[in-house]
Design a protein with these regions (language model features):
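N-terminal active-site beta-alpha-beta segment that forms phosphate/nucleotide-binding
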Residues: 1-41
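Structural motif
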Residues: 1-6, 100-103, 181-182
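ATP-dependent small-molecule kinase phosphotransfer cores
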Residues: 25-96
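ATP-dependent NMP and nucleoside kinases share a basic, alpha-helical "lid"
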Residues: 83-139
């Protein structure tokens, strides 16, 4: 499961878990971001130099440069290699493994999965989720100050998501598309 920034796959994974219980199947949910991304401090060291932090130059802390390294540039190489081995090792008869995370369908990882699903939502819904504290920037454990979280999204998180989504559609990768504007009314296409 991959998706646009702030995609919420929790309900979807829980529904799959419920169906697995009814069918007598096991379920393992694997957080690809926790398994592959660099630490928040390491990602900050990559992104912060692209943002202007001097309030004398930029009083509103609005300006910066777009990060162009994609999700791949935010991933820890050793952790990603371990993840590439762990996912196939998790396959067992009578068990379903669900991998979720931003960038989990990048070319380097997509062959690990049998079914590829992309969660999409409108930018407005994404911003509302950020403002409600429902999103932490890539590599972060908790939401930060709203304006800084949004700023980081504009220059990094949104950019990674848009480029990833473009590549996925260009190559006809997703098997399923989920409209995630309303987690209580997911639309699977």
């Amino acid at each position: 499961l991959d998706g646009y920034t702030t995609a919420n796959w929790t309900v979807f994974v829980n529904l799959i878990a419920r169906e697995c219980c009814l069918q007598g199947l096991g379920l393992e949910a694997i957080d690809a971001n926790a398994a592959t991304l660099k630490s928040g401090k390491e990602i900050d060291a990559i992104i912060d130099p692209l943002l202007i932090w001097d309030t004398k130059i930029d009083p509103t802390l609005l300006y910066g440069k777009v990060y162009k390294g994609g999700y791949q540039g935010l991933m820890d190489e050793a952790r990603t290699e371990a993840f590439k081995k762990a996912v196939p090792a998790s396959r067992q008869a009578g068990k379903i493994s669900v991998v979720y995370g931003y960038g989990s369908l990048i070319p380097e990882l997509r062959e690990l999965y049998d079914v590829k699903v992309f969660f999409d939502l409108t930018p407005m819904k994404s911003m509302l989720r950020i403002r409600r504290g429902e999103y932490s920037n890539l590599g972060k454990e908790r939401p930060g100050i709203i304006n800084r979280t949004i700023r980081r999204c504009y220059y990094c998180d949104f950019e990674c998501a848009v480029r990833n989504r473009h590549e996925l559609w260009e190559n006809n990768v997703p098997d399923w598309y989920v409209l995630d504007n309303d987690p209580q009314n997911l639309q699977l296409m």
